[in-house]
């Protein structure tokens, strides 16, 4: 796997975009999910928050109406590959196809911005090269903003992790699909008002990237 110190200087991979604007980008991986994505959208609407959803192609095939809903409500989507293959245990050819099949599929919905997030955050030479040549900005997350919600650690654990570590320019990693995400939804209902009270505005990743120097 390639390391952050190798990837960051290329300008093609982003973990966060520090700035003075009190803005945070909340991202959701592994959806869309017919149970949890609508609940997430309801909360985002309630707090006038924009977000970015890194979707898996095969889940979009099952729930195409949710992509329309996400986009209609002013959020953005990114390619989280077609089948969620990990660079840690897949061949270069399979990884390349998974990214490019996802790209082809997501182009039906959105042409810009071209955002990609590799499953598990794993990036090897094949993933980096394929994403770069496909025109993607690869988006990971702030290392201090992974509350491991996918492991269902408890609502308060998720809330405390995100709120206590919040800094302007953060990219927060949450999940709206792949399993029982009721803890994530319950945590989001507390995270949004708390950070709003602290003066934060919730933006899409592409808006956050405008602050990148």
From Swiss-Prot:
PANTHER family: CHITIN DEACETYLASE 1-RELATED (PTHR10587:SF133), GLYCOSYL TRANSFERASE-RELATED (PTHR10587)
Protein's recorded name: Peptidoglycan-N-acetylglucosamine deacetylase BC_3618
Enzyme class name: hydrolase
Record: active site: 29, 175
Chemical reaction(s) catalysed: peptidoglycan-N-acetyl-D-glucosamine + H2O = peptidoglycan-D-glucosamine + acetate
Source organism of the structure: Bacillus cereus (strain ATCC 14579 / DSM 31 / CCUG 7414 / JCM 2152 / NBRC 15305 / NCIMB 9373 / NCTC 2599 / NRRL B-3711)
GO term, biological process aspect, one: carbohydrate metabolic process
Protein's UniProt keywords contain Transmembrane: no
Membership in a protein family: Belongs to the polysaccharide deacetylase family.
One Pfam family recorded for the sequence: Polysacc_deac_1
GO molecular-function terms, A-Z: hydrolase activity, acting on carbon-nitrogen (but not peptide) bonds; metal ion binding
Keyword Zinc: yes
Activity regulation info: Inhibited by CuCl(2) and ZnCl(2).
Names of the cofactor(s): Zn(2+)
